[in-house]
């Protein structure tokens, strides 16, 4: 009889990828199956193993992709197959996340499970909006309340008198459609009409939006701008603190929604830094890398080459791993090292090695080109060269529907090509997704890092709007600020 797998009910946190717990991230990294919701940031799925099965259980307003009963059945079925299963849920599984129902279903079938708490949006979204849910001067009590229950009309039956009289700060979850009902009942049961209210949409994301008012005015304000879920509604005097301590929305790239052409299997440093400055960054395409057999003759003759050219930082790192795994002493290599990029140069420098730029190669003698399958297009001056393929990198088709759902939620304003090598795979990836690349980018600004990248984009039929003065992140950020003005 097959041993049952374990199910991990993991809180993904409120949106910002960096707010997931260490234990939650570890569960994703070890998962064989992940069932994920709409409100779990899809970028968290990139921590999963390449062969992990991804199942979307997302719930859009009035449109459920997979009903709760079906989710419960899937969790049980996958665990009975002996799989390590992660149920990835926005916020905390136990705070209006139906984690209790899923745990009960697993217990009923004797499936081992663990619950991994997450930061709930009622606290995190408020904090990112500059509002602590408690404050000695404004509020010493706090409550989280569902604004939409399982009744036929969805209007929650609450102890309104207790909420109005006894709770200083109230966080209503998913309350946009029932906002008139909420405000009416709070005022009817004694809450002052001028009590501050704020709605926070997509809290902790770069696309976070807020609308402020009072119990008497907020309904009209929300209707005027067609505000929608996912949103937290925060009611209480502590909302007024926001004017003084708002911090997230002051980041230099807050509100920017950027599409970044991707060349690496991991998150790029550019994406990481832009995110830290407040932007939402979607990287595309998502790559997966598989191992390849290394040519034994090349390994045996590694000491005979005059020049070794690394096509990418990843291939440089893989090269040294390959040498170590084959028991080869680096000191046996007499070749000069050459690189195309600063990142590759850094990989070698960190190992105490010096390298030269590929443009300085001249007549390389016996040359070894080290790279992945899509890099190996070097053209020398007629000299023969050998190839060490360190891995085979392909666009990860499993992530294409994930990318399409991210696009549904986004309102992109900028596309960035970080290198000339990023242009062709990006265009081919969009085509594979069934998207018209030119239509997708017709209303957004295109930024290219360097003149060579700009020429590659133009050759692909793309209109380039900006080329930063220098090929570094600081210059890129200044360029993005200029676009936003």
Locations of the language-model features?
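Class I S-adenosyl-L-methionine
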Residues: 1-17, 22-119, 123-124, 231, ...
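A glycine- and small-aliphatic-rich helix-loop capping segment at beta-alpha/alpha-beta transitions
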Residues: 25, 101-110, 130-136, 188, ...
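Short, basic, glycine/proline-bearing loop/turn elements
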Residues: 3-12, 56-61, 143-148, 281-286, ...
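Catalytic phosphate-donor-binding core of small-molecule kinases
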Residues: 135, 148-151, 185-221
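Class I SAM-dependent methyltransferase SAM-binding "motif I" and its flanking Rossmann-like core
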Residues: 92-94, 99-166
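Signature of uroporphyrinogen-III synthase
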Residues: 14-15, 61, 67-75, 79-81, ...
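Well-ordered beta-strand positions
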Residues: 32-33, 53, 169, 307, ...
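Conserved anion/nucleotide-ligand pocket segment
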Residues: 152-198
């Amino acid at each position: 009889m097959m041993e049952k797998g374990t199910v991990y009910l993991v809180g993904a946190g409120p949106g910002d990828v960096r707010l997931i717990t260490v234990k939650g991230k570890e569960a994703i990294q070890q998962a064989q199956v992940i069932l994920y919701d709409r409100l779990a940031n899809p970028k968290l799925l990139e921590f999963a193993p390449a062969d992990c099965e991804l199942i979307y259980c997302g719930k859009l307003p009035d449109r459920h992709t997979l009903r709760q009963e079906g989710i419960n059945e899937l969790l049980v079925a996958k665990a009975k197959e002996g799989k390590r299963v992660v149920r990835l849920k926005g916020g905390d599984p136990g705070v209006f996340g139906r984690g209790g129902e899923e745990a009960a279903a697993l217990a009923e079938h004797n499936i081992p499970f663990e619950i991994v708490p997450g930061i709930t949006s009622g606290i995190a979204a408020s904090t990112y909006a500059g509002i602590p849910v408690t404050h000695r001067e404004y509020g010493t009590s706090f409550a989280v309340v569902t604004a939409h229950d399982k009744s036929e009309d969805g209007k929650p039956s609450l102890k309104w008198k207790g909420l109005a009289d006894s709770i200083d700060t109230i966080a209503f979850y998913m309350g946009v459609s029932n906002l008139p009902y909420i405000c009416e009942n709070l005022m009817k049961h004694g809450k002052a009409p001028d009590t501050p209210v704020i709605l926070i949409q997509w809290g902790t994301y770069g696309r976070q939006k807020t609308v402020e008012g009072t119990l008497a005015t907020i309904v009209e304000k929300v209707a005027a701008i067609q505000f929608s879920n996912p949103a937290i509604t925060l009611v209480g005097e502590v909302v007024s603190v926001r004017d003084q301590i708002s911090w997230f929305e002051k980041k230099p790239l807050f509100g920017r929604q950027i599409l970044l052409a991707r060349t690496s299997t991991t998150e790029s440093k550019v994406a990481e830094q832009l995110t830290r400055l407040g932007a939402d960054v979607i990287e595309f395409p998502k790559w997966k890398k598989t191992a390849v057999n290394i040519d034994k003759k090349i390994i045996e003759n590694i000491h005979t080459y005059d020049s070794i050219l690394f096509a990418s930082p990843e291939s440089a790192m893989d090269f040294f791993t390959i040498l170590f795994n084959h028991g080869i002493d680096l000191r046996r290599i007499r070749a000069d090292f050459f690189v195309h990029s600063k990142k590759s140069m850094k990989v070698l420098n960190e190992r105490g090695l010096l390298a030269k730029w590929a443009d300085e190669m001249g007549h390389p003698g016996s040359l070894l080109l080290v790279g992945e399958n899509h890099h190996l297009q070097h053209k020398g001056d007629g000299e023969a060269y050998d190839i060490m393929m360190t891995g085979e990198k392909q666009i990860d088709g499993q992530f294409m529907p994930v990318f399409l759902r991210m696009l549904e939620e986004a309102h992109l304003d900028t596309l960035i090509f970080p290198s000339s090598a990023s242009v062709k795979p990006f265009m081919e990836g969009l085509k594979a997704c069934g998207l018209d690349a030119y239509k997708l980018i017709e209303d957004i600004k295109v930024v290219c890092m360097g003149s060579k990248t700009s020429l590659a984009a133009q050759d692909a039929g793309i209109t380039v709007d900006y080329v930063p003065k220098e090929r570094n992140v600081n210059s890129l950020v200044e360029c993005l600020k200029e676009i936003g003005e």
